[in-house]
Every structure is written in C-alpha cells, then in structure tokens.
C-alpha cells in the first residue's frame, strides 16, 4: 500500500520571528478566543517595529517578552483531508477472527498435553506470549489469558529464578530476567536476589566472550528488567550498568539487523520515556523484517498479523479524533493567539500514544483541550503577560465567575472565558464517570498551577534567583504534571474514589515525584533557550548559586543523578503492594508522565516540534503500517 504523503504547514513569514498573524500583519492578537457570554469588540495588541530578540513593544506602549516559537506545523485543511480504509467496518471482522485464533494459542500452551507446549520451554513460551502481546499493543484483548499464563509461571518461580521449562532444574538468565520484569509489572512479588547466582567470582554477570544472539537477547532482557528497579536494589543498579555497556558494545560488533534495531530502540527509549504506541510501531517493523527473512514461528506470525490490523484500525480512529481536535482548535479562535505555541496535534499524538483503548475517545480529546490551555497559560505567564496583568488573571481564576473578566485586559478575556467553559465542561464529563462532582479538584489544581507560574513571573520581573530547594518545590507544580493529569484521568471509565485519588494526586508521594522528575528533566533540556529569553532561574542556575564554583556540567550531573534516583522511587510508588489502590489505577497517571517525559528525550519536543516530534506524529498517527 502506498505511504501517505505528509505535507505539514510551512512556516509562516514573520518579523524577527515574533508573534505575527497568518495574514502577515504584525498583530499579537486579532481577536479573543471566545465571545461566549460577552458582547465586546475585539481589541488587538499590535507589535510595533521596536523589537529585540526577546521583547517587543505593543501598539498600546506595553513592553512584552516574546517566545520566538515556530508556527503550527499541521494545517487544518490537511488534517481534515486525512482518510483511512482501515475502519472497524472494513477490518473489524478480520480482527475478531484473529483475536479468537490468538486466544486459542494461549489455550494450547496452557494445556498439559497441548501441541505447542513442552516441559522444556513451557515457562518461556508463556512469558514470551505475554511480552509479545504487550509490546504489540494488543494485550487488552487477552487479560484473562495473561493472568492464567502469569499465575502458571509464578507457581514455578523460586528464589533462584526459573529456567525455560518447568522440568529444567537450572535457572537461565534470559527466562529469569524476562519473568522478573513481566511478573513485577503485573504486581507479583519478585526479588532481585534471583540475579545473584548469575554473577561470577568477581561479582559480575557471567557471560561468554562470544556474543551469540541468544546471549545478547538475555542481556537485553536483563537491561529491560533493570529499568523497573526500586531505590534500594543494588543488584539491579549493577545490572543496568553492566547491561548498558554490554549492549552498546554489541551494537558496534553485530551486523545491522532486527536485533540491533531492537537494542538501539530499548537503549534510546527507556521505559520511563517510552510511548507504548511508538514501541508497538517499532516492534511491528522489527517482526515484519523477521517475517521477510522467514525467521518467525507460527505463533508470532499470528500475533504480528493481528497487531498490524489493530494498529491500522486504531489509526483510522486516531485520524477521526484528530479531525475533531483540529476543528475545535480552529473554531475556538486559538489560531489568532499568535504569541502561543500551537501544538494540538502533538498533544494528541502524546495521548493516543499512551492510551489505545478505542472507547476512550472522550478522554483523549479532552486531554488535548487541557494541554492546549496549559500551553496558552504557560506562554502567557512565561512571556507575553505583564506582571500586573498576570496578577489580575490569577485573581480572576480564583474567583471563578464569568463576570471576573471585567478587570482583565482585552486579550485575556477570551482566554479566561474559554478556560472557564472548558474546565466546567470537563468536570461535567468527569461527573458521569465518577458519579460525583470533581470541579473543586480541577479548580484547586488550576489555582496552584497559576500561583506557581505567577511566582516564577515575579522572579523574572525582579531578576531573583531562588535557592535550588525553593525553585524545585515551586517547579513541581509549574511543571503542569498535576493539571495535565488530574481532570483527564477522572474522565476515564475507571473509578477513582477519594482514597485512590489521594494516592496519585497532590500531595501524594506519587504526584510529588512525577512533578519533580518532569521539572528536572525539562530544565536540563530548556535552560539555555529560557535564559536567552531572560528567564534566569532554572534548576541549573539555582544549583550553581547554592554551590559557588560549580559549573553547568556539575549541575547537570547532579540533576541527572537526582532524576535516576527519583525514577526508582516512582517505580516503587507505582508497583508497591497495595490492596486498596490497584496498579491499574495508578498506571493511567504514570503513563501520562511517561508521555510527557518522552517529549524531553532530546530537547523540548513541544517548543521545537519540527524534528523528532514531527517524525513521531507521522509514524504513530498519520501513517498506517503496511499490511
């Protein structure tokens, strides 16, 4: 099948890369976002020719900071023209047939005398099936079968690990590492001591000098297992260091192949910054290559066929949802707010990359709406708004009434009204799912968020650089993790009673860690550009202030060490045994955190969305996989 030709909207001409409208008129704002409930004439804020690289004087004489962000990459006309032949009506019957066939495979490897089962490798077969359906993004169809398989494997688990088959006395590294990872992620209690027996007399993981494919696969599974370590697990830290070095060396010696591509992907996108849909697309491509080389077994061929069908059916749904998102964005008047980053397509890519359940369209679309407003507020508080205007807006949000717009400057009125309407609309949606009013949760999160941003705006206006601790405490909130997570997860078809919500929302340890990691990671990617715009305070500058004589490299090393430590703590908060709060409830918030981290892999992938992020949009949303 031919590949879609992707034609992003070309960058618009601009004056010193300032906030220029699509008609090339130097206007920061042509009209407010919304006129709902208001009768007013829009008043534009026009940039004069008096500009520097980071400031501009508007025609009302106000000196404003600017972000110099590139324009929207995805034209609405292009989005509305998307089409796919892979809708459920065309491919749903084929998918159901394949689902039934894969369930039969699960059943046959679970039979004592089944044709696909052998006492020599039955445990590895169960683990491989579970791992494959999860990496291929089709596990939602097989939750019962997965539970049966993992219960079976766990019944043979021992303090010395397991071998590939229940009759194999000696444990092997590959099966033990894969089993450790899969079992821990599903809430089974496993301890890392199982890896001690694989060490040599020098305390290192024992392996031969010959890098066979089997040995490399074993070390790859060890690396994947090491990424879900808890803070106190020294052996897992050692395993990560060893396996990372081993795999990097292997990439230099083995030929380019599906195995080398799998290794490169896993090293590049560690579990905490991986998007499940990108992993699915990558793994499909890897298995397709193996299928071409005729190295796939019958079971995996069937899984691959189902994965391709499911990927493309969801791709059809993605394009329909993206049309709704783009239409909403266009009709809201947001394109006229030319001082903000327009990243609605990128936000949709994030959320559809972490949740591929077809029935959750409402969740995905409303997640984009929340993130869109987070971006508007971010750019307004970070750059465009004056400190007096921002204080007025913060007070208006606390008041939470349409009449609060009376005191706002004209360009803020539309922002406020649309924010007010959207948050209330989302609260009504959440009420349907949760059976109770959740507006107060949303308002509290929003007020805290704007309060943290106002504090940062005050730091900018006075040139104040806080202590590292003061900055990070505020940054956990201004990272927007809480506001981007709270309302969307309440619209899922998952109950979040108060006792569950308090384990993932503020002031829980889970929320604290997620916000901290996002702030720390974001600053390491953004501090140089932020500093060029006049934002001196960052984790890096605050650390250097607290530690006279330290360099930027010292600060980055310290912060990266903090991130690694906090990732392990977040692992524990997600996976720790808790009868009252199931892993499945926390996983939704955790996956949003993974998605947000993904966009800071190389740089600030939201602000600079015309490189890796653009490719991600194409690969996971716009293009189907070849059938």
Swiss-Prot record:
Gene3D superfamilies reported for this sequence: Farnesyl Diphosphate Synthase, Terpene synthase, N-terminal domain
UniProt cofactor note: Binds 3 Mg(2+) or Mn(2+) ions per subunit.
GO terms for cellular component: chloroplast
GO annotation terms (biological process): diterpenoid biosynthetic process; monoterpene biosynthetic process
Ranges spanned by the short sequence motif DDXXD motif, renumbered to the chain: 378-382
Transit peptide, from-to: 1-36
Catalysed transformations (reactions): (2E)-geranyl diphosphate = (+)-car-3-ene + diphosphate
EC number, UniProt record: 4.2.3.107
InterPro entries documented for this protein: Isoprenoid_synthase_dom_sf (IPR008949), Terpene_cyclase-like_1_C (IPR034741), Terpene_cyclase_plant_C1 (IPR044814), Terpene_synth_N (IPR001906), Terpene_synth_N_sf (IPR036965), Terpene_synthase-like (IPR050148), Terpene_synthase_metal-bd (IPR005630), Terpenoid_cyclase/PrenylTrfase (IPR008930)
Positions that bind Mg(2+) 2: 378, 382
Primary localization class, coarse: plastid
Database matches in SUPFAM superfamilies: Terpenoid cyclases/Protein prenyltransferases (SSF48239), Terpenoid synthases (SSF48576)
Residue positions binding Mg(2+) 3: 530
Listed pathway(s): Terpene metabolism; oleoresin biosynthesis
Enzyme class: lyase
Molecular function as annotated in GO: lyase activity; magnesium ion binding; terpene synthase activity
Taxonomic superkingdom: Eukaryota
Its job: Terpene synthase (TPS) involved in defensive oleoresin formation in conifers in response to insect attack or other injury.
Family: Belongs to the terpene synthase family. Tpsd subfamily.
Alphabetized PANTHER family for the sequence: OS04G0344100 PROTEIN-RELATED (PTHR31225)
Protein name per Swiss-Prot or TrEMBL: Carene synthase, chloroplastic
Gene source species: Picea glauca (White spruce)
Gene encoding the protein: 3CAR
């Amino acid at each position: 099948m031919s590949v879609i030709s992707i034609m992003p909207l070309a960058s618009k001409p601009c004056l010193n890369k300032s906030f220029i409208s699509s008609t090339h008129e130097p206007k920061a704002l042509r009209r407010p976002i919304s006129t709902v409930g208001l009768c007013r004439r829009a008043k534009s804020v026009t940039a004069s020719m008096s500009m520097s690289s980071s400031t501009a004087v508007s025609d009302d004489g106000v000196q404003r900071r600017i972000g110099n962000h590139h324009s929207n990459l995805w034209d609405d006309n292009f989005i509305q023209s998307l089409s796919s032949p892979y809708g459920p009506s065309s491919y749903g019957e084929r998918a159901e047939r394949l689902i039934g066939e894969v369930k039969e495979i699960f059943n046959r490897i679970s039979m004592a005398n089944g044709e696909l089962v052998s006492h020599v490798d039955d445990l590895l077969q169960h683990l491989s099936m579970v791992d494959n359906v999860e990496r291929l993004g089709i596990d939602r169809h097989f939750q019962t079968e997965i539970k049966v398989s993992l219960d079976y494997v766990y019944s043979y688990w021992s303090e010395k690990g397991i071998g590939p088959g229940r009759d194999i006395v000696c444990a092997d590294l590959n099966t033990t590492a894969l089993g450790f990872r899969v079992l821990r992620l599903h809430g089974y209690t496993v301890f890392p001591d199982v890896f001690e027996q694989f060490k040599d007399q020098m305390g290192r993981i024992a392996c031969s000098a010959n890098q066979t494919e089997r040995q490399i696969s074993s070390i790859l599974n060890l690396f994947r297992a090491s990424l879900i370590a808890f803070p106190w697990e020294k052996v897992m830290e050692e395993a990560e260091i060893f396996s990372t070095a081993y795999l990097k060396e292997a990439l230099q010696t083995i030929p380019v192949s599906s195995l080398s591509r799998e290794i490169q992907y896993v090293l590049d996108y560690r579990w905490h910054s991986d998007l499940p849909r990108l992993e699915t697309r990558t793994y499909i491509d890897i298995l397709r290559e193996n299928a071409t080389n005729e190295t796939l077994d019958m079971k995996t061929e069937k899984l691959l066929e189902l994965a391709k069908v499911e990927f493309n059916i969801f791709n059809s749904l993605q394009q329909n949802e993206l049309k709704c998102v783009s239409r909403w964005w266009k009709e809201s008047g947001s394109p006229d707010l030319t001082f903000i980053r327009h990243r609605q397509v990128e936000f949709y890519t994030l959320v559809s990359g972490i949740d591929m359940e077809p029935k959750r369209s409402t969740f995905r679309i409303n997640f984009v709406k929340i993130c869109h407003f987070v971006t508007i507020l971010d750019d307004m508080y970070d750059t465009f708004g004056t400190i007096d205007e921002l204080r007025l807006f913060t007070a208006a949000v606390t008041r939470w009434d349409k009449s609060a717009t009376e005191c706002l400057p004209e360009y803020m009125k539309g922002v406020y009204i649309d924010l007010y309407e959207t948050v209330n609309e989302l609260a009504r949606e959440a009420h349907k799912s949760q059976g109770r009013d959740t507006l107060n949760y949303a308002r509290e999160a929003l007020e805290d968020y704007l309060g943290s941003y106002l504090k940062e705006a005050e730091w900018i206006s006075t040139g104040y650089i806080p202590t590292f601790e003061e900055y990070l405490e505020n940054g956990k909130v201004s990272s927007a993790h809480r506001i981007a997570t709270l309302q969307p997860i309440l619209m899922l078809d998952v109950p979040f009673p108060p006792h569950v919500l308090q384990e993932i929302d503020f002031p829980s340890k889970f929320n604290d860690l997620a916000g901290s990691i996002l702030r720390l990671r974001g600053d390491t990617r953004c501090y140089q550009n932020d500093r060029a715009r006049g934002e001196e305070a960052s984790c890096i500058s605050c650390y250097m202030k607290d530690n006279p004589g330290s360099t930027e490299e010292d600060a980055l090393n310290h912060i990266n060490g903090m991130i690694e430590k906090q990732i392990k703590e977040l692992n524990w908060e997600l996976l720790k045994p808790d009868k009252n709060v199931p892993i499945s409830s926390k996983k939704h918030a955790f996956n949003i955190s993974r998605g947000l981290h993904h966009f800071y892999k190389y740089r600030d992938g939201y602000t600079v969305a015309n490189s890796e992020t653009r490719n991600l949009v194409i690969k996971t949303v716009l293009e189907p996989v070849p059938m």
